[in-house]
Amino acid sequence: MKGILGLSLLPLLTAASPVFVDSIHNEAAPILSATNAKEVPDSYIVVFKKHVTSELASAHHSWVQDIHDSQSERTELKKRSLFGLGDEVYLGLKNTFDIAGSLIGYSGHFHEDVIEQVRRHPDVDYIERDSEVHTMEGATEKNAPWGLARISHRDSLTFGNFNKYLYASEGGEGVDAYTIDTGINVDHVDFEGRATWGKTIPTNDEDLDGNGHGTHCSGTMAGKKYGVAKKANLYAVKVLRSSGSGTMSDVVSGVEYAVQAHIKKAKDAKNGKVKGFKGSVANMSLGGGKSKTLEDAVNAGVEAGLHFAVAAGNDNADACNYSPAAAEKAITVGASTLADERAYFSNYGECTDIFAPGLNILSTWIGSNYATNIISGTSMASPHIAGLLAYFVSLQPSSDSAFAVEELTPAKLKKDIIAIATEGALTDIPSNTPNVSHAAVGIYKRNELTQKFSSLPGTVVVPRTTPTSLAAVATRSPLPRTASRTVLRVSFTRPKSCSPRSLVPSTARSRMPSSHRSELVLSRRRSEDLVFF
C-alpha cells in the first residue's frame, strides 16, 4: 500500500503497559505518510479502531506516555528536531481527540521504538506521520472588492453592479461560525463584538492572530462590511502560528474543538438553555499533503452536524491530492476571478465542489481594529461559501421555535447550494471539474426553486419572474429598509391556522420603483420564522 512503511519487529517494552504481551497483534497497523508534504520529524497521529471507548483510549494514553518516559532516547530526540516549534513537541503525548465518537485518537512526538509498539497494539487502526499545513493565500494586489457582489448575481458583473451586494440583513443570525486558522483579530470594528476567542491549539502560543490570514477569512465570512453572513457569531480556533504554518495534528485538534462546541451548543438549545441557535459552520482555508486523519476528522464533524467549507488549494493541481480539500463530506471551494475564469492558481478536479471569488479580495486585517488588506487564494474563496452556509442556516427557524422544521443537515445544504449555483459560467475549467460557481445568494428561476425545494416544509416559492438578486426575498424582517430594492412576489407555506398579511406598509410601497410595486406580496407567520433558500 502506498505510503506504508515496513518496519521490523523490535523488542517490546512492557513494564508500564496495562496489556499483556500475548494480547499484542502480530499484524501491525500501517504507518501512513504524505508524499506531497513536509513531515514533522518523529511526530505521529494515532487513530483508534471503532470499538475503542473513551475509557480504553484513556488507558492507552497512560500506557504510551509511560513507555515514552522510559525511553532513554528522549533526550537525544530533542536534539534531532528540525521543525523548530519548541520543546512541547518532544514530550511524548501531545493532544488527544474525540470527534463526536466517530474518530478517536491522539498525537505526539515519539521515538520509533515506541511507535513500533503502538502500531502492534490491538486498539490501533492506523498511524500517520504528522506533517506541515499552511495558509492558502497568494499574492497581495490592489483592486476594488467584488466577491460579495459576484455571489449575489447570477450573470456576469457589469459596471452598474460590480460593487453591489444584495442580501438579507439578518443573514447569519443565530449561527456560530468557526474560523480554524491563524486566529481572529476579535476587536476589529467590522465584527461588531460578535467575534470571540475560542481556543489556541499550538502549545505556548498566544491568543491573537499574528498573521492576518484568519482575520481576513473571518471578515469575508461574517464581517459587517466585508462579510456574507453579517450577523453570524465568529469563534477563533487557532491551529496555525503567526508564520502561517502548523501541524496536521493541531488542525485535527482544532476540528475536534469546533465539533464539540457545536454539539454542546445544540444540546443546550434543545434543552432550552440557549435561545435562537440555528446551527454552526466552519471554514478551513488551509491545507497540506494528503492526510487520512484530517479527512476523517472533517467528515466526522460534518456527520455531527457542523457545516464545513474548505479551500481547494493553490497548486494549480488536482485537489484530490491534498487535505482537507479531499474530504468528501465538506464543500471544497476553488477560486474564480472577476472575469469569471478559474484563478490561475486554483486547484481543480473531481474533489472541487464549487468555485467562489478568490482573486483580489478585500477584507479585515490585523495591525489595528480598522485594518484591511487585499489578498488572493482559494483561502479567500472558501469563506465566501462558509458565509453562504451560515446565511442559509440562519434563515431557518431555530429549534426552539414553534414553527421549527426538519433539521437542515450539512449533507442536504451542500446538495442544495450546489444545485442552486451557477452552472457553466467559468472558463478554463478542466473537463474533470464541475463548472459550478458562486452559489448566488437567492437567485432562482421558478422551476429551479420549486423542483429542488418543494419537499422542504416552509420553503419560499417563486410564482413568477426571474430575479437578478436576492433583494428582499431573503429579508425576514419588515421591509421598509429594503423597499428600494427589487423585490419578488413570493408565497410561504404555513399552517392553516396562520393568516398571511402584507409585510410592507404603504409608505414603503411608495418608495419602490413603480415597476415592482405590483409584485410585492409576501406572506408570513412571524418575521423570525420565515424559511428561505
Curated annotation (Swiss-Prot):
Gene name tied to this protein: pepC
Residues of the active site: D181, H213, S379
Keywords in alphabetical order: Disulfide bond, Glycoprotein, Hydrolase, Protease, Serine protease, Signal, Zymogen
Homology family: Belongs to the peptidase S8 family.
Residues glycosylated per entry: N283, N435
Boundaries of every Peptidase S8 domain copy: 145-450
InterPro entries hit by this protein: PCSK9_ProteinaseK-like, Peptidase_S8/S53_dom, Peptidase_S8/S53_dom_sf, Peptidase_S8_His-AS, Peptidase_S8_Ser-AS, Peptidase_S8_subtilisin-like, Peptidase_S8_subtilisin-rel, S8pro/Inhibitor_I9
Species this protein is from: Aspergillus niger
Signal sequence, start to end: 1-16
Cysteines engaged in disulfide bonds, as pairs: C320-C351
Single GO term (MF): serine-type endopeptidase activity
GO biological process, one term: proteolysis
Protein name: Subtilisin-like serine protease pepC
EC number: 3.4.21.-
Gene3D superfamilies documented for this protein: Peptidase S8 propeptide/proteinase inhibitor I9 (3.30.70.80), Peptidase S8/S53 domain (3.40.50.200)
Disordered as annotated region, ranges: 496-519
A Pfam family per the record: Peptidase_S8
Matches recorded under SUPFAM superfamilies: Protease propeptides/inhibitors, Subtilisin-like
